């Protein structure tokens, strides 16, 4: 516990809260260009090949975004839209790539939860 004199010399400083998605800069989404599309393996109890892409955003940030759903058409120089939302078992992946927007196609044969994967309503 500081003394009164110590508090006069240097007042208490509020701790700044850490932002979860700094690259978005308060925007709901940001556009970017894929610089690398690859697969990576998740943390310990899980096992898979998760599809991710390194994306250079319009504000200059370079982030890693997760590509949700089965199958994708992304490659280098694809223009994508990114939203916040981390992937718990992939360290460093704090963003999701939106399906069915810009160069990213929606998921084929998706019947449920279609809006999350940019899939049109089946006939």
UniProtKB/Swiss-Prot annotation:
GO biological process: translation
Domain of life: Bacteria
UniProt xrefs under InterPro entries: NA-bd_OB-fold, Ribosomal_uS12, Ribosomal_uS12_bac
Residue positions where 3-methylthioaspartic acid is found in the record: 89
GO cellular component, one term: small ribosomal subunit
GO molecular function per UniProt: rRNA binding; structural constituent of ribosome; tRNA binding
SUPFAM superfamilies in alphabetical order: Nucleic acid-binding proteins
Keyword terms, alphabetized: Methylation, Ribonucleoprotein, Ribosomal protein, RNA-binding, rRNA-binding, tRNA-binding
One Pfam short name: Ribosom_S12_S23
Family, similarity comment: Belongs to the universal ribosomal protein uS12 family.
Function: With S4 and S5 plays an important role in translational accuracy. Interacts with and stabilizes bases of the 16S rRNA that are involved in tRNA selection in the A site and with the mRNA backbone. Located at the interface of the 30S and 50S subunits, it traverses the body of the 30S subunit contacting proteins on the other side and probably holding the rRNA structure together. The combined cluster of proteins S8, S12 and S17 appears to hold together the shoulder and platform of the 30S subunit.
SUBUNIT field: Part of the 30S ribosomal subunit. Contacts proteins S8 and S17. May interact with IF1 in the 30S initiation complex.
Name the record gives this protein: Small ribosomal subunit protein uS12
Source organism per UniProt: Nitrobacter winogradskyi (strain ATCC 25391 / DSM 10237 / CIP 104748 / NCIMB 11846 / Nb-255)
